[in-house]
Amino acid sequence: VLVILQQGQLINKTGVDVQGIVEIVSPQKTQNEWTFVGAPFASDYTLGAVKPVSEDVAMVKYNYTQGAWSNDWATINTHMEAAEGTFAWPFYTGAITFSTHNFGASTSSIYPANATADYTLNNGDVTVTKSTLQNTEGGYWMALANPYPAKLSVSKFLGENTSRLQGGCVYVFRNGTFDIDANHLSSGSDSIAMTEGFFVNFQENAEKKAVFTKSQLKNWNGNNTQAKSSSEFIELTLQNGKDKVRVYFAHNEDAEQGYDIFDANKMFATTGVAEPYFVTDGIALIKEEVAELPYYATMNVRSQQDTVMNFVLTNLPEGYAVSIIDGEEVIDLVEGGVYSTEILTGE
């Protein structure tokens, strides 16, 4: 069983579906309170995919015929559509988990010995079309959910759907209340988490259609792998003769543009070859894979001897730039290029 935890992501860069049983743990944690969720499955599914099932989680669907929420609780056999959002009320503390295994009429959350994958993680485009009825509060609402097991970019989703939407925004339901997520985000976030539901309000004369594509994913890059390994990181190799050390940088989606490169964290070396470590509040933290840095980050090199150091840059994603500030000179590194500089003893 593959488990994708609350802050995890699974971005499938291939056209081949993930096989086997996968659990997706929702980031929304509530107890005795409404939350808004949906499973990232490729096709219709039943609430038998919710773990724990039945008496532990109550769910209701949106009734498009009536333009209102259903008065009936969903049952273990109620069908949900791909990218459909539903209100859920957990009767326990913890997260709702969706499984590609259908537990069916059983209320057990334990996999049987012959458990099979009844549902497939969504790995393609999804188009949701409804004949929405104007509800009592006005507007033509659609209840949606992120159809991918990874973060969905609000701005990218709006880029393909804004012309049909009222207000050019989406509405999320977080911490028991509604909030607006738009290009100018009142919530300070541009992400719809995996399994998170949201609402859109269509213009009266617009086609009631919502389009999802994998290119709308927050961390989507069609040219590079997204697996959580060193290949995801920009790799900078420092060489000194036969000795070398690799330093990895990863993009942090929460960083702010315009970060002052001279204010970034610094990494020092205590040997002839640079060894990266942060100095934060006077504490040295050794860390090769650096995942929590701003868009711009500096690496200072410190050596115990005079030497010549070569900088080699690989795995640079499209649209990214890496520069070295050598004294007063700023050098833009190119993919696969080598920059040599003399490093004196000290920093």
Give residue ranges: language-model regions.
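Extracellular beta-helix/beta-solenoid repeat scaffolds
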Residues: 1-30
